[in-house]
Amino acid sequence: MHVFTGNMINQHKVSIFISRTEDGFNYFSHDKLFIMLDAATDKMDGLNVNIEESWNKQIANEWEGPYFKELVQFLRAELANNEIIYPPREQIFAAFENTPFDQVKVVIIGQDPYHGIGQANGLCFSVAPGVRIPPSLKNIFKELNRDLGIEIPQLGELSPWSKQGVLLLNATLTVRANQAGSHQNKGWEKFTDVVIKSISENREHVVFMLWG
């Protein structure tokens, strides 16, 4: 496999702030980008989500797109209805935080996040330490063992992969608890399509694996 290893242009991070407020939408394109999720409450319940600046240079236009605003409206309605959404809001963009655009070597694409309690952590197929390894990830580990002789790990946490240039990307970045596919066709797929197109057009020798 040929690997292109570029240097990061800028390690500064841009923050996305997902919040509950009655102020509705507010978007800023300065050092921080704010996505306001109105949950029909005056309580500010926000979490910072970091995205590497190198990603923001590629996808910044998406934040103002009509489809993305509709996606935010959908998530806002989910919160207003007290729906539980996975992964936790601070981990929704974990794939972009862990793997800067300029360091992407491999893209693994899943379908949508795990929908069980405590499973999804923002990296496709990955679970936090201490969480039982899901069947799909067990199968991945078994194939790695069978094909390459790699010892089957005891933990399902894949952040070491992401920090070596493997972008662990779900086509849909959120899901309602216990309802697989519940956030499909709400706008996430358009967003991740842009991500994939940007990588294919601006990075060289990247390997794409569609596992969803």
Protein language model regions, located:
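Short N-terminal signal/transit or membrane-insertion segments
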Residues: 33-51, 55, 94-106, 157-158
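N-terminal cationic leader/targeting segments used for protein routing and processing
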Residues: 8-14, 27, 31-33, 44
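Polybasic, low-complexity association/targeting segments
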Residues: 37-79
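Short, intrinsically disordered low-complexity segments enriched in Ser/Thr with adjacent Pro
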Residues: 4-12, 18-21
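Residues in and immediately flanking transmembrane alpha helices
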Residues: 15, 20-26, 123, 183
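A polyanion-binding, active-site-adjacent surface
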Residues: 61-210
